[in-house]
Amino acid sequence: MKVRTQMMYDMETLLRKVFKQIRNEINEILDKELSRNEFTILRILSEQGPKKVTEFAPILEVSASHITAVTDALVEKEWITRIRSKEDRRIIRIHITEAGEKVLQHFNEKKTEYFFKRFDCYTDAELATLIELFSKLDKKR
C-alpha cells in the first residue's frame, strides 16, 4: 500500500508541476498581447456564439466585475461588441468581431506551434498513450 501512496504523491506533484509549466508558457505566448481570460472569452464566443457577460464568470471562475473589466478591454481593442437584446433591453450579449476572430486564429496558431514544440520529443505512440490516459482520467470526474 505504501508504494501506491508514494505513486499518488509523485503523480500529484508532477501533474501540478507540469500543468503550471504549460500554463505559464502559454501565458507567456498570450500575455504579450492578450490575457488568458481574454483569449478564453474570444474562443468561447467563436465556438458557441454570442453570450451574456454574466455567463462567463462561472466558466472562468472569476467575479462578474472581473468579466466586465476583461470585456471592457476587449471592446476597447475592437475584438468584441456589446449588443442589446431586442426582446429585453436589459440583456446585453457580447459578440466576437471579425478582428477578434483574426486575433483568435493568430493565437490558436501560436498555441498549436507551442504544443508541437513542447511534445516534439514524444513518439506518436507515446502521444497516443498520453491522450488515452488523460481521456480515462477525464471520464473519472
Curated annotation (Swiss-Prot):
Q: Name one GO biological process term.
A: regulation of DNA-templated transcription
Mind listing the UniProt keywords for this protein, alphabetically? DNA-binding, Transcription, Transcription regulation
Keyword check for Phosphoprotein, yes or no: no
- List, for all copies, the residue spans of the domain called HTH marR-type: 4-139
The molecular function terms in GO held by this entry are: DNA binding; DNA-binding transcription factor activity
> Sorted alphabetically, which InterPro entries does this protein's record hold?
HTH_MarR-typ, MarR/SlyA-like, WH-like_DNA-bd_sf, WH_DNA-bd_sf
State the source organism's domain of life.
Answer: Bacteria
Could you tell me which Pfam families the record lists for this protein?
Answer: MarR
The answer to whether keyword Transcription regulation applies is yes
Q: Which residues bind DNA?
A: 53-76
Q: What is this protein called?
A: Uncharacterized HTH-type transcriptional regulator YpoP
The taxonomy runs: Bacteria, Bacillati, Bacillota, Bacilli, Bacillales
